[in-house]
Amino acid sequence: RFSVPDKESAEAVEEIKNKTNVPLVADIHFDYRLALMCIERGIDKVRINPGNIGGEENAEAVAKAAAAKNIPIRIGVNAGSLEKGLLDKCGGDLPKAMVESAKRHVEILNRFDFDNIVLSMKSSNVAATVKAYRLASQTFDYPLHLGVTEAGTIKQGIVKSCLLYTSPS
């Protein structure tokens, strides 16, 4: 996965793909048109952040382009960029708010007959992340991309990842 913050980065997808056989995931924030550019250039998966991708019409454009090329979309919910007011609506329950955010965006993509979806629920708080993934696994029938966000230094990241992946049921 690599960040695609601008047009130049999106234009580089084809060149990068020609130099590797590893599947590439474009991490898109704010500008849905960058996702469209990456899809046109053969990206293997697009990751969008429901908290900052823009309106429903933007999601529709990305869903239609991805569907035409059978490219999955990862809905990447990040605790730090939940939709305004969602955490309050969920009574301050962060894992519940994260799953609610994913649910909203799954429903949007499903309205456009798109269901080639992978979900992630990331927080820098390992306990909240584990709870969000457990709730997501009970709520959705989509693959889950596991991970933490803002993991910190290499050592901190290893510890947080180990805690996430070995958390008892």
Could you tell me what each predicted segment is?
Residues 50-57, 120-130, 153-159:
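Active-site glycine- and acidic-residue-rich loops that bind
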Residues 1-15, 50-53, 117-120:
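Glycine-rich, proline-tolerant flexible connector loops at the mouths of alpha/beta enzymes
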Residues 165-169:
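Conserved small/polar residues in nucleotide/adenosyl-binding loops
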Residues 35, 62, 95-110, 129-138, ...:
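Structured alpha-helical segments in the cores of large, soluble enzyme domains
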Residues 3-41:
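N-terminal active-site wall of soluble small-molecule enzyme domains
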Residues 1-2, 24-26, 46-48, 73, ...:
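Hydrophobic faces of well-ordered beta-strands that scaffold small-molecule active sites
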Residues 20-22, 40-46, 67-69, 138-142:
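Glycine-enriched alpha-helix->loop->beta-strand junction motifs that scaffold or abut catalytic
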Residues 54-112:
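Conserved anion-binding
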